[in-house]
Amino acid sequence: SLVGSEMCIRDSCAIPEQMFEDIKKIVTPEQMEEAVFTDEKQKREENIRAITEQLEEAFADNEEYLAVLGEAIYQYQKKTVRKMILKDHKRPDGRAINQIRPLAAEVDLIPRVHGSAMFTRGQTQICDVVTLAPLSEIQKIDGLDANITTKRYMHHYNFPAYSVGETKVSRGPGRREIGHGALAEKALVPVLPSIEEFPYTIRAVSETFESNGSTSMASTCASCMSLMAAGVPIKAMVAGISCGLVTGDTDDDFLVLTDIQGLEDFFGDMDFKVTGTHKGCLLYTSPSPRD
């Protein structure tokens, strides 16, 4: 019988207090700052990998340290990046707090589609393709809201593994693909022409070619350009950007970063997306702050 059997007691996975001090003797805060201070995502990952190998070799005989080494390096990285931002006002890629990464845009890069556009912001790149069809191709919706039975404009977002240097198999849309696609779709709906003005079904597909932060807002920019390339008479041009919040020990100690990259997203306290035209804001996301 299993009744009254002794409970299994698991060992704690907490990082020993002395471990951070021992790590800093091998990798100083200045060395960690130098490792993360680069505008190239791959170079930064190589630097952290080299630090990990160095610490694995140094702690080869300490099983307790090796068991939590990955988390300890992550926390060390996080503290370093947050200190750089809050105290020194220095971002990992050298930008100012309100500075946007270099932009590039191109339309009509695919000849045999109705509309196409490529939008690049730093190391984030999206290719969007728009297809037009008759109203008979409108999407029928059988949902909980009886007032919404069809959808004329559809935006689909794809995030293949190769965009972040991975080789895993894609098994259909996940939470990220559905959420990002809906976000970019809602950003463009207010500027679309009415059915009377433009009697077509519209489908936009955003393919992520490279990802280092805010692919949803890059999809908004790319889909806006591809809609115009397809001849859709939108009411205004729409752009989107992701901002990040980093907080200190007091309520007055905080910074809002413009155009966050992946590292700032991971180590920050909150990120929020903003889309709009030259006249004002169209869409704003307000996620819950992280612990």
Predicted regions span which residues?
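A structural-propensity feature for long, helix-poor, extended segments
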Residues: 149-170, 175-178, 182, 238-283
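A short glycine/serine-rich beta->alpha loop
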Residues: 169-174, 206-214
